[in-house]
Design a protein with these regions (language model features):
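Conserved acidic catalytic loop of the alpha/beta-hydrolase fold
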Residues: 74-91
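Short beta-strand/loop motif that positions the catalytic acidic residue
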Residues: 202, 208-210, 214
Length: 263
């Protein structure tokens, strides 16, 4: 089972969980979610069990006490501080969506922490028509059910959403005012995010994974990163933004890439 713990630094506290017993560090930086992914720690451990033998897997939440304004680069800085406090260096990073934005800044500002990284369904600069703005509006209005519906319809394929719609909507009943306030701060943190002009500072091996049906950020954003870095790109044709949850061999593709770049 995953162990949920808290790391305390001079500036903040951050919760995380870990599992696996390998000598290499694998750090997962999740994207936006209505409630903390830590509540699904055991499910995540099962989904990523293929890493557990060769890696110690760490998944970091955002800091516990959010400042009123919290740009993505500051999220990455706080994560770097947490990693340092836990003795994590030269890690294999997977960042999904907003977590992928954080991963870019982590590799730019703290190259010693990153051995290799995979960027999933993310962007180096957030497009003007991003669906995130609609989510911010719904969170501001306190519309938990509307936000849950919009979020799920945008990130999942129609077939996946139809299959799990009742379960997804039932989750809205557990979303608190505090959850909405936290979501709003984190979502607003993507506004003005732009790492594009600094991507050439990334020196580690990178794999970019995108989805042709991504309605949140778009597949073009994945291609833009890969073109700028000159790195490997793979686009899943039949999946949307949450391809990292839906595609059955997604984790295996990450694992193979990390194996290829291991010295």
């Amino acid at each position: 089972m995953a162990q949920i713990e808290t790391v305390k630094t001079e500036h903040m506290e951050m919760r995380y969980f870990r599992f696996g017993s390998g000598s290499r560090h694998f750090v997962i930086l999740p994207g936006l979610s209505l409630t903390s992914v830590l509540g699904s720690a055991d499910a995540v451990a099962v989904a990523y069990e293929c890493f557990a033998k060769d890696y110690t897997v760490w998944l970091f939440d955002r800091r516990t006490d959010l400042p009123p304004v919290y740009p993505v680069r500051e999220m990455a800085q706080d994560t770097a501080e947490a990693m340092g406090a836990l003795g994590i260096r030269d890690a294999y990073i997977f960042g999904a969506s907003q977590g992928g934005m954080m991963a870019q800044f982590l590799a730019i500002d703290h190259p010693e922490l990153v051995h290799a990284m995979v960027l999933g369904s993310t962007a180096a600069r957030v497009p003007e028509l991003s669906g995130i703005r609609e989510w911010i509006r719904l969170a501001e209005e306190g519309d938990a059910k509307g936000l849950t519906l919009s979020f799920s319809e945008m990130v999942y394929t129609p077939a996946f959403f139809a299959q799990y719609k009742d379960l997804i909507l039932a989750m809205a009943d557990g979303v608190t005012k505090e959850d909405l306030a936290r979501f709003m701060v984190l979502a607003k943190g993507t506004e003005g995010m732009n790492a594009y002009d600094e991507l050439d500072r990334i020196q580690c091996p990178v794999l970019v994974l995108g989805a042709a049906q991504d309605r949140v950020l778009g597949a073009a954003q994945s291609k833009e990163i890969a073109d700028r870095l000159g790195c490997e790109l793979y686009i899943y044709e039949d999946y949307g933004h949450a391809v990292y949850d839906e595609a059955p061999e997604y984790k295996d593709r990450i694992l193979r890439f990390f194996g290829e770049v291991t010295a």
